[in-house]
Amino acid sequence: MGLKAVHFGAGNIGRGFVAEFLHKSGYEVVFCDVMDSIIQKLQTTPSYKVIQVGAEGTSEDTITNYRAINSKTHEADVIEEIRTADVVTCSVGPNILKFIAPVIAKGIDGRSNDATPIAVIACENAIGATDTLANHIKGDHTPQERLDDHHQRARYANSAIDRIVPAQDPDAGLDVKLEKFYEWVVDRTPFSDHEPPAIQGIKWVDDLIPYIERKLFTVNTGHAAAAYHGYYHQKATVYDALQDPNILKEVHAALEETSRLIVGKHGIEAQEQKDYVDKIITRIGNPHLEDAVERVGRAPLRKLSRKERFIAPAAELAEEGKDFTALLDAAEMAFRFQNVEGDEESKELAKIMSENSAEQVVEKVCGLQSDHPLFPHVVAVVKKVQADE
């Protein structure tokens, strides 16, 4: 039997990032999704292209050796695939993990204890996403008496992924355009008694937290800050936003604040972090990505939440008595991202802002309590935005 990976979420990250490396590593990829249209396309198209764009030009890979299953209508088939697979990966969005957990749990439960445990790796933009998935699988969907030897059937490894996938050409079909740069870091510790799965592109580490926080508080903070400042100043793309010296200065300032936190907390060298920041600003300002500010800014409620790219680092800096002004400025711009066409959360944000006091907004949206040192500062920002409306 050849190697097989089951991947949930046949969107751009799934097809363009995860499946590309699985394919290059010799895996047959079985895509699972609930979108009829994408499943039908994959079932009737024997190959698609992954196009990497960088400052130095474009390259492409052809992806073959995959199948596709509608997990809504063919659950039994998905369970059978997981029962005989080597790896399960997913890129469905952090809020969807609970919905894919039941079918994965059934697949794992049907596995032999004598086979190598299946490796489960969630590839989501969230800290500890595989843990979240594992908790749903083990906590909600695995019989109590099957938990003791569950580790003989499955191992769960958290991961940090970093690759910018812009909005795609509507006529591209299954082809995916993304940036050349990537980072895929996965926790090695669950595989202490056997080799982790051989997947090209993965960097295996014993401590993932520095990588996750560095990525979230640099790439995600910088990307979103550029988008929200850009949207407020009526720029079309992140590239356009970063051509404005004032916006560029704001993004740099926010990343100087998060860099102070990252260097102090994780012992990363200051110069190494500075080089990382410079590389990130070049990446998010890649003119070939044509990334609309509305797309990068979408889901402002999630992006303003407690563990996310602005409030999490600002809260830690406030606790340490350090400067967080630029992060607060970026958060202000996120609060102004309201009633944006095609983005439900921006409409919900507008409703919350109009129906609540500033204090209630900060508790509700940012998850901050009134005794936190950051709380009054965010309240002041919300009051300012509310006054302008």
Curated annotation (Swiss-Prot):
Single Gene Ontology MF annotation: mannitol-1-phosphate 5-dehydrogenase activity
EC number(s) per entry: 1.1.1.17
EC category name: oxidoreductase
Record carries keyword NAD: yes
Residues reported in the UniProt entry to bind NAD(+): 5-16
Cross-referenced Pfam families: Mannitol_dh, Mannitol_dh_C
Reactions performed catalytically: D-mannitol 1-phosphate + NAD(+) = beta-D-fructose 6-phosphate + NADH + H(+)
Keyword annotations of the record: NAD, Oxidoreductase
Superkingdom, taxonomy of origin: Eukaryota
UniProt GO cellular component terms: cytosol
Single biological process term from Gene Ontology: mannitol catabolic process
Signal peptide residue numbers: none
Family from the record: Belongs to the mannitol dehydrogenase family.
Subunit (UniProt): Monomer.
Protein name from the UniProt record: Mannitol-1-phosphate 5-dehydrogenase
Organism in which the protein naturally occurs: Sclerotinia sclerotiorum (strain ATCC 18683 / 1980 / Ss-1) (White mold)
